[in-house]
Amino acid sequence: MVINCAFIGFGKSTTRYHLPYVLNRKDSWHVAHIFRRHAKPEEQAPIYSHIHFTSDLDEVLNDPDVKLVVVCTHADSHFEYAKRALEAGKNVLVEKPFTPTLAQAKELFALAKSKGLTVTPYQNRRFDSCFLTAKKAIESGKLGEIVEVESHFDYYRPVAETKPGLPQDGAFYGLGVHTMDQIISLFGRPDHVAYDIRSLRNKANPDDTFEAQLFYGDLKAIVKTSHLVKIDYPKFIVHGKKGSFIKYGIDQQETSLKANIMPGEPGFAADDSVGVLEYVNDEGVTVREEMKPEMGDYGRVYDALYQTITHGAPNYVKESEVLTNLEILERGFEQASPSTVTLAK
C-alpha cells in the first residue's frame, strides 16, 4: 500500500530534510501535492515532475486520497495549519517546534483523538547516527547505572546579523527541541530542570546559547548549545557506575544533503568517527571498546508513520514526550535565566 502525502511549505526544511527521504520510499509514500504561496524555479526539477504544486490550500485539504499532511512552515503558523489539516480529516506531521505553546499542542492532540487521526512532531534527530550510537552504549548495560549524560550541539559562527524575534526563533526552541527530545526518549520526564539561556553574539536577537540540566533522581542530563565553540567538543559524554562512553562527531546526513548526495547513493552520511566505551566488566577487568557509528536515517520517521497510519502502531513519539518537551521549552522563559523549575509528576 502506498500512502499519498502532501506538504505545506516548500523551503529548506521540505527540500532538504523531508523530500529526499520520502522520494526514496516509493513503495510506501507518494508526494501528491505541495502547497506554497508563490511558485519557485526549483519546482521545475525533474525529480518533482510528478508533484502537483499549488497556491490553493483547499486543493490539498479537499483531496480525499491524501492521508498525511506535513507542515513545514515558520513556527508561528504550525498550529493553524495543523489544525486545518486535522479538521479536514488528515493525519499530520509537524516540523519543529511542534507548536509555540503547550496549550496549542494539547488542543491538537485532543482534536486528533476526536477524529481518530494521528498528529506528531518531526523528531528526525532520534535517528541521528551519533545519538543512536550513544543510545546503544547506554542500553548495552556495560556502563552500569547511568549517572550523567552530556549532549552538545555546537558551532563556531561568531557573527550574527540582527534578527529580532520571539523565544521560538532562538536556539533553545530551534535546537533544544531536538536534543532534549533525545534525552526524554531515553529517560522520560525529569523531576527538575535548571536553565541557563543567553544571547551572546547579538543582544538584539533571541538566544543563541543555552544549557539545560534535566534531573532524574541520581541522574543528570546536560543539554548544551553554543555558537562560539571553535575546537571540536564531544557530541556525547556518558558516565555510569561501571564506566564511560565518549563520542566525537555529529551525524553526517545533513553534510551529505548539502553536498547533493542523496539517501541511497554511495557515500551518503559516511562517518568514520567512532565512539569509545571503557568499563569494568564482571571480572573486575577494564575493557576498552571502539563502537562504530550506527547508521542514521531520518527517513525512519516516515517508516514509523507508515506503520502508525496503516497498521495502528503506536506513534514513534509519545504524546507525553511531546508535552514534556514543550513544557520544558516554555518554562525556560518564565523567569530570568539562570533558573530552576520543578515539573509536576
Curated annotation (Swiss-Prot):
Enzyme class: oxidoreductase
Xref: InterPro entries: Gfo/Idh/MocA-like_OxRdtase_C (IPR004104), Gfo/Idh/MocA-like_OxRdtase_N (IPR000683), Gfo/Idh/MocA_oxidoreduct (IPR051317), NAD(P)-bd_dom_sf (IPR036291)
Disulfide feature: none
Highest taxon above the source species: Bacteria
A molecular-function term among this protein's GO annotations: scyllo-inositol dehydrogenase (NADP+) activity
Pfam families, alphabetized: GFO_IDH_MocA, GFO_IDH_MocA_C
EC number of the protein: 1.-.-.-
Entry keywords, A to Z: Oxidoreductase
Biological process terms in GO annotation: antibiotic biosynthetic process
Keyword Transmembrane helix recorded: no
Gene3D superfamilies: Dihydrodipicolinate Reductase, domain 2, NAD(P)-binding Rossmann-like Domain
Keyword Oxidoreductase: yes
Any one cellular-component term (Gene Ontology): cytosol
Similarity-based family: Belongs to the Gfo/Idh/MocA family. Biliverdin reductase subfamily.
Record-given protein name: Uncharacterized oxidoreductase YhhX
Lineage: Bacteria, Pseudomonadati, Pseudomonadota, Gammaproteobacteria, Enterobacterales
Gene: yhhX
